Amino acid sequence: MSQVFKVAVLPGDGIGPEVMAEALRVLDAIEKKYDVKFERTHANVGGAGIDLEGKALPETTITICKTSDAILFGSVGGPKWETLPPDEQPERGALLPLRKIFGLYANLRPAIIFPSLTGASSLKEEVIAGGFNVLVIRELTGGIYFAQPKGIEGEGRDRVGFDTMRYSVPEIERITHVAFQAARKRGKKVCSIDKANVLSSSVLWREVVTGIAKEYPDVELSHMYVDNAAMQLVRWPKQFDVILCENMFGDILSDEAAMLTGSLGMLPSASLAEGTFGMYEPSGGSAPDIAGQGIANPIAQILSMGMMLRFSFGMVDAADAIDNAVAKVLDQGCRTRDIFQEKPGEKLVNTKEMGDAIIVAL
């Protein structure tokens, strides 16, 4: 009897439904190839949730997610909902509560340049010749974004705004284990990012990470101040394998690393809880300017689905097959508009045609 996994499918807004459709077609192909069954339940989120059910994260959606093994998330947001109070807008009203409800503490964002796409990067080709593959692991639930006290006090020009940057030993330990376990399956290097020369929380961060590293003698650990890391990512990204960051530093560096690749439409992400539950989504936004035109790049959504197979369902072979199929299609010259450079051998394709090519390559 086939193994059965339950997936909550949240397409969201903008290009979300279009790219999600291609990811689900690839999932159909995986079902046939690996004799497995994915029970999919669609639910509203973001602007779609607001329009159809009155809030960005409806209770029905939460219930569906709670009865699923993983969440496959599209994208949320758009100009239509920007006039709502900030906490009710699609991004803050959906993503932050999902992270809190499901304890999603570890964000994994690969920044990959495939060898056939080095010309799309903003970096000089000699810096990234042969491509690169960096994994940024960001702690999601602690640090300056969440620690108390925070706020604005006083009146007029006497007002003061303040935030607290706080980390506990257990918070640092669990994200560090995620980084080292990931590095063991890759290039066996972890670079931990901090600002230990000025921040007390970073002093503790470095101390705890150094201690945990002793449990992984096969993995090389280095430390780097965040300002230097921002520079080194641009100077020589291939020096990195796994980059371990607290929340704010990871927020900034993961976006920087992503843009080095040339297109956010290529980059997946995973947000993991304790155990095997996770939420998987593209790193890019909802791109309302191209929604409905059938030209969006579905690769990030497809690779996010591949990360779901790898991290939540333990289907490493299937995840590798998806990664290899995407690489093969790119080597064959298939390009959506965002990565099309008009080079010899390139073929401009739409959203569905890119999905078709990846399914054939599988």
Swiss-Prot record:
One GO CC term, this protein: cytosol
SMART domains per UniProt: Iso_dh
Swiss-Prot/TrEMBL GO biological process terms: L-leucine biosynthetic process
Keyword terms, alphabetized: Amino-acid biosynthesis, Branched-chain amino acid biosynthesis, Cytoplasm, Leucine biosynthesis, Magnesium, Manganese, Metal-binding, NAD, Oxidoreductase
Stretches that traverse the bilayer: none
Cofactor binding notes: Binds 1 Mg(2+) or Mn(2+) ion per subunit.
Residues annotated as site: Important for catalysis: 145, 195
GO MF assignments: 3-isopropylmalate dehydrogenase activity; magnesium ion binding; NAD binding
Record-listed NAD(+) binding positions: 78-91, 285-297
One Pfam entry name: Iso_dh
EC code(s) of this entry: 1.1.1.85
InterPro entries: IsoCit/isopropylmalate_DH_CS, IsoPropMal-DH-like_dom, Isopropylmalate_DH
Positions with a binding annotation for substrate: 99, 109, 138, 227
Cofactor: Mg(2+); Mn(2+)
Pathway the protein takes part in: Amino-acid biosynthesis; L-leucine biosynthesis; L-leucine from 3-methyl-2-oxobutanoate: step 3/4
Superkingdom, taxonomy of origin: Bacteria
PANTHER family assigned: 3-ISOPROPYLMALATE DEHYDROGENASE
HAMAP family linked: LeuB_type1 (MF_01033)
Protein name: 3-isopropylmalate dehydrogenase
Species of provenance: Geobacter metallireducens (strain ATCC 53774 / DSM 7210 / GS-15)
